[in-house]
C-alpha cells in the first residue's frame, strides 16, 4: 500500500482511484473522545485491519503526530509495520499469536503488549529476553477469546505458580452496539470487575485494565478503567445507529464524529447509448432513454461491493450518478445523462462529499446489507492513501 503525504497529492492525477485522509477530522475526533475520558484513562488508537481500511502507515504517523501514546493492532505483522515507524511506542497486539516460540526474534520487545488467553502462550512469551508485556484476556460474555469461571481460576493459579508477571487484564463487550438497553454490557462490566478482584487475590495488582471500544467508551464512563480502545469511531464513523441513539438518551447530544476518509476516482471514458441498449455483463441493465454513460476505473477488486450493481450511486460534479449494470472487476458504469458537464477527467466521489451531496460508508452498508466496518476494511490496500488538510 502506498502512503503519500499531502506534499505529493498532485500525483493523484495518475491513479485510477485514491483515498484522501483528513488530518483535521482525525484531530477533531480525538479531541471529542479526550473530552469524555475519565481522568486516569488513556486513549489507545486501534489501527488493526489496515487501520479499518484507512492505511496503517499513514494513520500511524498521523496518530503519533496527534499525541497518541499507544496503538492497538491484531497481528504481529501489523505491529512490525508500526515498529518500523516508531521504535518505542507501546503496541497492543490483540489477536491470538500462533506458535510464538517461532517468532522470538520479533516478539522480544518490552513495548509489545500482548493479549493472551492460554497459559501456555504466556509461559513461552515470558521466557523471552526482553519479554513483552502480557495482558490476560477475560471472557465476560463475548464467547470468543479469553477464559472465565473455573478455567480462569486455573489459568491464574498456573501463571502464579510459574512466576509469570502480568502487565494488564482486559475484556471485550459483546452487544453494546446492537441494543438500546444495556443490561448485558453492565453484566459484563460486573464480571470484569470480579475478574480483576480475582486476579488481585493471586497477587496480580496494579494491572492496566481495559474493556471499552468505541461504543462503550461513549456510553459507559464507569468502564473506562485505565485505558480505552478506540477503533471505528477514531475514523469518524458511528459503531451503529443504536449507539448514537443510546448516547442521545444519556443526554449527550453534542458528541460529534467527522469521517476522515474520502474515496475518489475520475471518469476515464464517456459513451452515448440509444434507448433499449444493454449495459455491462449479463446484459442486466437496459436503458429506457438515450443515455450518457461514464466509465469509472473502480470495481470489486478495489473493494466496491458488487451488490451495488444498479443499486448505488457515485457523485459527479456535486450530483448523484446512478450505477448501472453489473460492477466489473475494475470498472463501474454511471448514468450521467443529467450531468452535462461530466467528461473524461471529471472527479468521481465514491465515498465522501461533493458540494451539498454526500455518500457515506453507512449509505453503502445499508444498500449492501452489511456494516460500515466491512465497507471500509474491504477497500483495497493497493489504493494510495493521501493525507489532506
Swiss-Prot record:
CDD domains in the record: PLPDE_III_AR (cd00430)
Cofactor(s) this protein requires: pyridoxal 5'-phosphate
Domain of life the protein comes from: Bacteria
Annotated positions binding substrate: 144, 329
Protein's UniProt keywords contain Isomerase: yes
A GO molecular function held by the record: pyridoxal phosphate binding
Active site: 48, 281
InterPro entries attached to this UniProt entry: Ala_racemase, Ala_racemase/Decarboxylase_C, Ala_racemase_C, Ala_racemase_N, Ala_racemase_pyridoxalP-BS, PLP-binding_barrel
Family recorded in the similarity comment: Belongs to the alanine racemase family.
Name by which UniProt lists this protein: Alanine racemase
Originating species: Leptospira interrogans serogroup Icterohaemorrhagiae serovar copenhageni (strain Fiocruz L1-130)
Lineage, broadest ranks: Bacteria, Pseudomonadati, Spirochaetota, Spirochaetia, Leptospirales
Amino acid at each position: 500500500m502506498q502512503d503519500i503525504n499531502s506534499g505529493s497529492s498532485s500525483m493523484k492525477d495518475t491513479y485510477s482511484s485514491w483515498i484522501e485522509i483528513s488530518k483535521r477530522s482525525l484531530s477533531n475526533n480525538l479531541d471529542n473522545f479526550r473530552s469524555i475520558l475519565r481522568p486516569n484513562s488513556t486513549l489507545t488508537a486501534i489501527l488493526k485491519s489496515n487501520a479499518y481500511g484507512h492505511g496503517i502507515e499513514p494513520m500511524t504517523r498521523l496518530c503519533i503526530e496527534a499525541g497518541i501514546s499507544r496503538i492497538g493492532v491484531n497481528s504481529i505483522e501489523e505491529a512490525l509495520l508500526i515498529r518500523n515507524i516508531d521504535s518505542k511506542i507501546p503496541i497492543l497486539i490483540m489477536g491470538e499469536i500462533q506458535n510464538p516460540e517461532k517468532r522470538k526474534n520479533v516478539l522480544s520487545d518490552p513495548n509489545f503488549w500482548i493479549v493472551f488467553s492460554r497459559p501456555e502462550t504466556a509461559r513461552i512469551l515470558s521466557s523471552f529476553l526482553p519479554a513483552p508485556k502480557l495482558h490476560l484476556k477475560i471472557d465476560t460474555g463475548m464467547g470468543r477469546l479469553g477464559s472465565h469461571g473455573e478455567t480462569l481460576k486455573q489459568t491464574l493459579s498456573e501463571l502464579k505458580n510459574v512466576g509469570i508477571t502480568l502487565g494488564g487484564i482486559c475484556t471485550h463487550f459483546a452487544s453494546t452496539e446492537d441494543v438500546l438497553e444495556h443490561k448485558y454490557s453492565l453484566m459484563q462490566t460486573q464480571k470484569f470487575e470480579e475478574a480483576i478482584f480475582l486476579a488481585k487475590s493471586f497477587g496480580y495488582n496494579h494491572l492496566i485494565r481495559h474493556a471499552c471500544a468505541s461504543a462503550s467508551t461513549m456510553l459507559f464512563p464507569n468502564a473506562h478503567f485505565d485505558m480505552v480502545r478506540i477503533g471505528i469511531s477514531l475514523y469518524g464513523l458511528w459503531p451503529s445507529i443504536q449507539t448514537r441513539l443510546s448516547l442521545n438518551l444519556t443526554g449527550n447530544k453534542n458528541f460529534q464524529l467527522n469521517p476522515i476518509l474520502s474515496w475518489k476516482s475520475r471518469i476515464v471514458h464517456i459513451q452515448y447509448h440509444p434507448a433499449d441498449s444493454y449495459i455491462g455483463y449479463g446484459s442486466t441493465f437496459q436503458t429506457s432513454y438515450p443515455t450518457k454513460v461514464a466509465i469509472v476505473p473502480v470495481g470489486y477488486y478495489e473493494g466496491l461491493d458488487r451488490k451495488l450493481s444498479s443499486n448505488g450511486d457515485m457523485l459527479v460534479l456535486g450530483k448523484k450518478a446512478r450505477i448501472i449494470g453489473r460492477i466489473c472487476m475494475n470498472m463501474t458504469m454511471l448514468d450521467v445523462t443529467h450531468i452535462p458537464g461530466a467528461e473524461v477527467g471529471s472527479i468521481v466521489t465514491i465515498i465522501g462529499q461533493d458540494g451539498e451531496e454526500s455518500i457515506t460508508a453507512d449509505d453503502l452498508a445499508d444498500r449492501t446489507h452489511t456494516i460500515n466496518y466491512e465497507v471500509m476494511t474491504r477497500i483495497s490496500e493497493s489504493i494510495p492513501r493521501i493525507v489532506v488538510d
